[in-house]
Regions:
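A short, polar/charged loop-to-alpha-helix boundary motif
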Residues: 79-91
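Bacterial N-terminal signal peptides
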Residues: 7-14
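Short, glycine-anchored, charge-dense loop/turn motifs used at functional sites
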Residues: 65-71
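Short beta-strand scaffold segments in enzyme catalytic cores
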Residues: 59-65
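Positively charged n-region of N-terminal signal peptides that target proteins for export
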Residues: 1-4
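Short beta->alpha transition motifs characteristic of CBS
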Residues: 71-79
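Zinc-dependent deaminase
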Residues: 10, 20-51, 118, 125-196
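Immediate flanking context of iron-sulfur cluster ligation sites
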Residues: 105-116
Length: 196
């Protein structure tokens, strides 16, 4: 009997076509959340080239309310606005705060969707903004390997966000996101980082 149960578990684990096979989270995986995030993030990734043609960096973020309404969608603007903290996540937070007329987004139960794992700076901005949920695509390690960007030191951030009531889902639609990052690099776009 144990052998049958073990075989069934192995078959289920190895051959599952689950939408969240590679997805990670700081809560029990919710397939409905992953499905919604997959659609939104795939759309953001498709918009990436439109933004990079206008001088933006290869990262796009959007903030939605808990009813699924888009609040803002923006891109990284470090190079075209000459400001090192204008990452997509930070720009999205600033735009949402301005649109909603507040520095505290917590009462709005907002969700941030972004084409790559937030860097060290953006994690602080997200935490202090009051965003309730974060969904990202390409993990930092892949971003660094593909582009050479420095994503910073981020120990145990999933746990730290959970302690603060912030839900995180990652590694959503990574293949398309990685492809867009490769396109950015292969087209000779600016890799911006401090000269140390």
């Amino acid at each position: 009997m144990k052998k049958i149960i073990l075989m069934a578990f192995i078959a289920l684990f190895c051959f599952s076509n689950s939408v969240n096979a590679k997805v990670i989270s700081n809560e029990k995986i919710d397939n409905a959340k992953v499905e919604t995030a997959s659609k939104i993030i795939a759309d953001l990734q498709k918009d990436m080239q439109n933004f990079t043609k206008k001088g933006s960096g290869p990262f796009v973020a959007a903030i939605y309310d808990d009813k699924g309404n888009l609040i803002v969608k923006v891109a990284n603007s470090v190079v075209n606005e000459q400001c090192s903290n204008n990452h997509a996540e930070m720009n999205a937070i600033k735009a949402a705060e301005k649109k909603l007329g507040t520095f505290d987004l917590a009462p709005y139960n907002l969700k941030l969707y972004v084409t790559a794992e937030p860097c060290m700076m953006c994690l602080g901005g997200i935490m202090w903004s009051g965003i309730k949920e974060v969904y990202y695509s390409v993990p930092s390690k892949s971003v660094e390997e593909i582009t050479g960007f420095d994503e910073g030191f981020k120990p145990h951030w999933f746990k730290e966000f959970k302690k603060r009531g912030i839900i995180v889902y990652g590694n959503i639609e990574t293949e398309l996101g990685e492809q867009e990052l490769h396109n950015y690099v292969n087209n000779g776009k600016k890799i911006y980082k401090p000269s140390r």
